[in-house]
Amino acid sequence: MKDLFRRAPKRFTAARIENQAIPDNMWVKCPSCGDLIYTRQFSDNLKVCKCGYHMRLAAREWLGLLDDGSFVEFDAALAPVDALEFISPRHVYAHKLSESQEQTGLNDALITGSGAIEGMPLCVAVTEFEFIGGSMGGAFGERLARIIEQAADARVPLLTINASGGARQEEGTLALLQMAKVNMALTRLAAVGQPHIAVLVDPCYGGVLASYTSVADIIIAEPGARIGFAGRRVIEQTIRQKLPAHFQTAEFLLSHGMIDMVTPRGELRSVLATLLRLFHNAPERAADVQNAPALARA
């Protein structure tokens, strides 16, 4: 088993976003090592620096994991509602929604749909961190619950790719109840024997981590991803202690048994394909076992 994921990685190309603006600068500076990287080379390397630092991908770029032309989007018109007419000293929620929709071209922070990896069908949900921090509100939760139901009905695996600050505070209790709602939907997916594979990318916090991602059958994280419930600064201010430098990193969580693996972005499609192959014929294998003669008891 230890050699299961050591095959030559099959890379994926980040999907091109329509009408994407030409970058103003020809170079990108890595925030980790400070090196200047030629923009085209940086894009070809899936926005990963040679030092290993993984920069953020847009939600639609993550769809490059799927087979070309296989993605079909669901519920794109489903949009958040400002039920509380939320206003704070810093912003008006309705204005913030409009700005995020204009900036990202999305109605909300989650894209859902169906697709395939190496010909194996699945349902997928991808967060967009640039849309109010990838936060989960009412429309987000409804989209996610619907795609989980779709996966259960079609009896295919669910893949979620998650970068989020947690539940959307501007929607109050409506946002919090989505945590229970999507987890309830996941029980139906489990009942039909289909897996939920969660990929955690930097950052993944709050209600998103505390609900559907933590109960996934397989939890994968990118190297160096920050993952936790409360943020590092909040914890340090609360306990009045300095936390270790590697606290809440993907590697820290792996060493404490909280996630299953840490996978570099360039190897992710290959690892997902391997996992999907393991699950692909699971119902048939289960039926074979059920129909096999009972073992003689000692």
From Swiss-Prot:
Pathway: Lipid metabolism; malonyl-CoA biosynthesis; malonyl-CoA from acetyl-CoA: step 1/1. One of its GO terms (molecular function) is zinc ion binding. Gene3D superfamilies: 2-enoyl-CoA Hydratase, Chain A, domain 1. It is found in: Cytoplasm. Its main location: cytoplasm. Keywords: ATP-binding, Cytoplasm, Fatty acid biosynthesis, Fatty acid metabolism, Lipid biosynthesis, Lipid metabolism, Metal-binding, Nucleotide-binding, Transferase, Zinc, Zinc-finger. InterPro entries: AcCoA_carboxyl_beta, Acetyl_CoA_COase_Trfase_b_su, ClpP/crotonase-like_dom_sf, COA_CT_N, Znf-ACC. It holds the Pfam family Carboxyl_trans. Zn(2+) binds at C30, C33, C49, C51. PROSITE patterns: COA_CT_NTER. The keyword Lipid metabolism applies. GO terms for cellular component: acetyl-CoA carboxylase complex. Its EC number is 2.1.3.15. Belongs to the AccD/PCCB family. Acetyl-CoA carboxylase is a heterohexamer composed of biotin carboxyl carrier protein (AccB), biotin carboxylase (AccC) and two subunits each of ACCase subunit alpha (AccA) and ACCase subunit beta (AccD). This is Acetyl-coenzyme A carboxylase carboxyl transferase subunit beta 1. It comes from Roseiflexus castenholzii (strain DSM 13941 / HLO8).
